[in-house]
């Protein structure tokens, strides 16, 4: 079985994007942003809120908090 290698950051952002989970993003200057991730790449995150999009550079992000519990990994009980 070939296993894809994906870093934790991409896995997290892709999960919240697919599940449309609302996030709170804190920037390094203390600004608090909320919204849903619509897209991301190696350098930035596109955040949507109230019909408006914001492009946030990853180097400016301090912390990302999902607005609800989320599961990123499959449970290990079914694995043999």
Swiss-Prot record:
Gene3D superfamilies: 2.30.30.100. PROSITE patterns: SM. One of its GO terms (molecular function) is RNA binding. GO terms for biological process: regulation of DNA-templated transcription; regulation of RNA stability; regulation of translation, ncRNA-mediated. Coiled coil: none annotated. One of its GO terms (cellular component) is cytosol. The keyword RNA-binding applies. Pfam families: Hfq (PF17209). It comes from the Bacteria. Keywords: RNA-binding, Stress response. InterPro entries: Hfq, LSM_dom_sf, Sm. SUPFAM superfamilies: Sm-like ribonucleoproteins (SSF50182). RNA chaperone that binds small regulatory RNA (sRNAs) and mRNAs to facilitate mRNA translational regulation in response to envelope stress, environmental stress and changes in metabolite concentrations. Also binds with high specificity to tRNAs. Homohexamer. PANTHER family: RNA-BINDING PROTEIN HFQ. Belongs to the Hfq family. This is RNA-binding protein Hfq. It comes from Agrobacterium fabrum (strain C58 / ATCC 33970). The gene is hfq.
């Amino acid at each position: 079985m070939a296993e894809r290698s994906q870093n934790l950051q991409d896995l997290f952002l892709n999960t919240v994007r697919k599940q449309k989970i609302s996030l709170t993003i804190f920037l390094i200057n203390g600004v608090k942003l909320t919204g849903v991730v619509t897209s991301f790449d190696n350098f930035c995150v596109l955040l949507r809120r109230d019909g408006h999009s914001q492009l946030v550079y990853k180097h400016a992000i301090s912390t990302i908090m999902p607005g609800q519990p989320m599961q990123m990994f499959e449970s290990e009980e079914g694995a043999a």
